[in-house]
């Protein structure tokens, strides 16, 4: 399997990490443990190397830093290019992005560039089999990211998988996942 690892887009604004980065790292740690893999934070910005230790404290095993003066302020095109380039080079199995104003802009553009699906506004993320219940004449795949989100106006929930494409990408609203204490 050439795709490996759980990656988190570590959002920062004005060289300060957003709370969602820590929440996603907490969830990524759980998912990575289930997959026997590691957690990588992707930090994009200008002069952001000072944030690396904080990401490590909150669960990142590795941090990939894309540091360039052009990336000082969030702009769609340069950030999408940076994150898509990291995904294409390192081939993560899972990529988590916060469903913030930045993440909602960035996530869909990046998933389109790397030709994979994106499940937005997930409330539950877990590793499991898909289809969840075996179906005759259909292979049940193991170790899939099962992404649960509200559907149809929030009256029901849907659990979505992306069995045939990698990475599996999800956005998660702030406040849904728990950060781990360093």
Task: Identify what each model region corresponds to.
Residues 1-182:
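N-terminal glycine-rich FAD/FM-binding segment characteristic of electron-transfer flavoproteins
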């Amino acid at each position: 399997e050439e795709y490996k690892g759980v990656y988190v887009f570590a959002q920062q604004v004005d060289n300060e990490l957003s709370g969602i980065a820590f929440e996603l790292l907490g969830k990524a740690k759980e998912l990575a443990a289930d997959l026997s893999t590691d957690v990588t934070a992707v930090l994009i910005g200008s002069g952001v190397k000072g944030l690396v230790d904080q990401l490590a404290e909150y669960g990142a095993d590795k941090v990939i830093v894309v540091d360039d003066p052009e990336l000082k302020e969030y702009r769609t095109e340069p950030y999408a290019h940076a994150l898509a380039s990291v995904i294409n080079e390192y081939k993560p199995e899972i990529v988590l992005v916060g469903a913030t104003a930045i993440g909602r802009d960035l996530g869909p553009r990046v998933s389109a560039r790397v030709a994979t699906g994106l499940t937005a506004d997930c409330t539950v993320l877990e590793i499991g089999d898909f289809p969840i219940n075996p179906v005759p004449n259909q292979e049940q795949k193991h170790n899939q990211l099962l992404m649960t989100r509200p559907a149809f106006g929030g009256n029901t929930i849907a659990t979505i998988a992306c069995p045939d494409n990698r990475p599996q990408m999800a956005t998660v609203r702030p406040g849904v996942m728990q950060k781990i204490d360093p």
